[in-house]
């Protein structure tokens, strides 16, 4: 392992991001659409400070940033660096902010200046303030419409989805973010150069990337799904995902299993049974047996348990099913 340099070059993160773009261009050029080709081409023509600012924003969470918080010696004036990004449409210099977005970008002291009436509830948390204001502030508007901020602006990155797609192709997943790779010169993360043949690429066609992103959207939606809303729309979205690659089909099966568990927590047995039936994820058959039992379909549960006994998928399934069989046999008569 190469020792980390105590004083990396000022634009080390930009250099590494550009290395990532070059790597993607060499290996995935045939999967890029016109927008992605244009991004890679135009990024290279931007002033260094503008390229660095965009990478800095991509390394951080979210898409909205206070310009006053984007202070980097090597970049200089944030608004000057942002101007070419604004010209390309990659950054919105005056995005409409919901109340939630405004709260996420503001301290309690700043919120008190914007909403003086909150002083009567100074001891409450920001979350409490948000709930107080939400019923009467449901219109999104730019920062200067919320309050006069002559010395500050909000900048919104508008190419986040495109860059997430590039990040997915680079890492092969969405768990890792750009900060991991671009910080490698600090010794925080180390990567070896490994040659990858085209046949060994994680994504063989553009549809594979589309499928991964669609599955990720479904997973994110499941985690945030309202308790009182049926899963019908989510199930339709999952059905629409074309998983041509076996490893993508496995991800879909895992998500269907998670959906089945969510349905069980709601005691929505029929929806749970449907999700488990369509999932090949380990444990799905055992969960189907349990759900059939909860539905009062003892004969069907017993038949599936006996079928499982003809070829267990794992020792864990064998133990679970064999514990269930005596009870199912008694209940089925």
Regions found by a protein language model. Name each.
Residues 284, 313-314:
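Helix-capping and short linker residues that terminate individual alpha-solenoid repeat units
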Residues 68-69, 304, 316:
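Residue-level detector of alpha-helical recognition elements and their boundaries
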Residues 254, 258, 283-294, 320-327:
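"A position-specific structural signal for the A-helix of alpha-solenoid helical repeats
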Residues 255, 271, 297-303, 318-320:
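Extended, non-transmembrane interaction/recognition domains
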Residues 2-39, 44-52, 56-268, 273, ...:
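N-terminal alpha-helical interaction modules that lie
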Residues 294-304, 324-333:
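Alpha-helical linker/edge segments of TPR/alpha-solenoid repeat scaffolds
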Residues 273-276, 288-292, 302, 309:
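Heptad-repeat coiled-coil alpha-helices
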